[in-house]
């Protein structure tokens, strides 16, 4: 599994082609491509070489100086919360569950956004799960278990303050997950989210 960001200052089609080429080469193996050394069993395929420009992501283009003008903010917030409240009630009546995932830099406003969202919701119909370092109980199981156990029942919602994406973000960067573990996590995360969607859960990230 590989990710190709299509909102970056390089040709996403070219990057997708390079990524596919690397994946095909890694799966064909040494027989079809004798000029390439076979990768050790169980090791992830090396990422394709990228230029400095190609390595840029959408986060490199974020304008950290942008601010929302205070004029009309409260009115717009109240209107949005009212609409959200109506949608939440309708989802509860129709037994539609929802999972909302918040990821972002530290102090980027995740907690504030969650508070503004839950202010419009019946507290009996949702849970907020703050994801921190795993406990000993969680370490003894697959890393997705700590999220599976909070998947909401029909008509209810779960908001995750940080999520399973930590496996390929902080755990990868800080060295808490081995390369084979975080490489495998891309497919595991996709499968997990597909199972949620197949069950009729509304997933917002």
Which ranges hold each PLM region?
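Glycine-rich phosphate-binding loop of ATP-dependent small-molecule kinases
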Residues: 1-205
């Amino acid at each position: 599994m590989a990710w190709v960001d299509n909102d970056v200052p390089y040709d996403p089609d070219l990057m997708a082609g390079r990524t596919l080429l690397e994946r095909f080469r890694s799966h064909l193996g040494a027989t079809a491509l004798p000029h390439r050394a076979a990768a050790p069993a169980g090791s992830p395929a090396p990422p394709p070489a990228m230029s400095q420009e190609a390595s840029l992501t959408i986060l490199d283009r974020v304008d950290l100086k942008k601010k929302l003008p205070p004029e009309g903010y409260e009115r717009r917030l109240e209107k949005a919360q009212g609409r959200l409240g109506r949608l939440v009630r309708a989802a509860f009546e129709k037994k539609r569950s929802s999972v909302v995932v918040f990821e972002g830099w530290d102090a980027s406003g995740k907690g504030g956004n969650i508070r503004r969202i839950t202010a419009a919701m019946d507290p009996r119909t949702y849970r907020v799960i703050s994801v921190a370092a795993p406990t000993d109980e969680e370490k003894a199981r697959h890393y997705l278990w700590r999220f599976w156990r909070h998947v909401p029942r029909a008509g209810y919602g779960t908001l995750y303050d940080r999520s399973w994406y930590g496996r390929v973000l902080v755990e990868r960067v800080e060295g808490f997950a081995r390369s084979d573990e975080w490489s495998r996590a891309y497919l595991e995360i996709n499968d997990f989210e597909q199972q949620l969607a197949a069950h009729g859960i509304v997933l917002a990230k």
